[in-house]
Structures are given as C-alpha cells and as structure tokens.
C-alpha cells in the first residue's frame, strides 16, 4: 500500500515542501486499533524534519511531501513505509500499519 493521504482540512494548495526544506508539523500517531503511541500535540511542541534526508519513516517522507502548507491529513502507512518487521520495541509491534493525523504548519 505504501502511504495513503486523506485530507481532513485543505491547505493553501500552492506551497508544497521541496527536497532539502525543513517542514514543521503537528501529529498524532495511532496503531490500527486506535491506540495513540505518540503526539507532538500532547507535548505542545511541533516536530521538524528535513524532506529527503531520511530523518523519518518513508510514509512521512512521501506523504508530507504531497501536502500543502496549512493542510491537515490522515496518513496511513503500511509496515514497509513505517517500522517494518522490527517495529519499535515496546511501542510499535512488528508489521504494524500506522495512522498519523498530520498538520503541515509551515516550511523553514
């Protein structure tokens, strides 16, 4: 499956991240059963990463790159676009499909 992007709230439709740009997002990550495993919103601190530097899972690299500034979307990432057969011990089980509610706040 890779990554599926479903828009929750439209962005500006014009400003998309480019390779090498820093994106600033708020997100909530959930397992298939709906259990939340991580949230920048709970910490009240947006998360930043650089597009194209493999700093995040592939589902984020490809999914967030399709979003425009201001957009909020649900990213559904198959295991091969998330943490794969290894998972993240104690947090994400092996071969887990993950869902992220991501809002692209701005580019830097």
Curated annotation (Swiss-Prot):
GO terms for molecular function: activin binding; calcium channel inhibitor activity; FK506 binding; peptidyl-prolyl cis-trans isomerase activity; protein homodimerization activity; SMAD binding; transmembrane transporter binding. The gene is fkbp1a. Keywords: Cytoplasm, Isomerase, Rotamase. It is found in: Cytoplasm. The keyword Transcription does not apply. Residues 20-108 form the PPIase FKBP-type domain. This is Peptidyl-prolyl cis-trans isomerase FKBP1A. It catalyses: [protein]-peptidylproline (omega=180) = [protein]-peptidylproline (omega=0). Keeps in an inactive conformation TGFBR1, the TGF-beta type I serine/threonine kinase receptor, preventing TGF-beta receptor activation in absence of ligand. May modulate the RYR1 calcium channel activity. PPIases accelerate the folding of proteins. It catalyzes the cis-trans isomerization of proline imidic peptide bonds in oligopeptides. Inhibited by both FK506 and rapamycin. PANTHER family: PEPTIDYL-PROLYL CIS-TRANS ISOMERASE, PEPTIDYL-PROLYL CIS-TRANS ISOMERASE FKBP1A-RELATED. PROSITE patterns: FKBP_PPIASE. The lineage of its organism: Eukaryota, Metazoa, Chordata, Craniata, Vertebrata.
């Amino acid at each position: 499956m890779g990554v599926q992007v479903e828009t929750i709230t439209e962005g500006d439709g014009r400003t998309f991240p480019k390779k090498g740009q820093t994106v600033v997002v708020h997100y909530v990550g959930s397992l298939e059963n709906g259990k939340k495993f991580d949230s920048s919103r709970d910490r009240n601190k947006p998360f930043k990463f650089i597009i194209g530097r493999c700093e995040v899972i592939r589902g984020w690299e490809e999914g967030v790159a399709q979003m425009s500034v201001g957009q909020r979307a649900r990213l559904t990432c198959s295991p091969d676009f998330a943490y794969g057969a290894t998972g993240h011990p104690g947090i994400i089980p092996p071969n887990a499909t993950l869902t992220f509610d991501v809002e692209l706040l701005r580019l830097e």
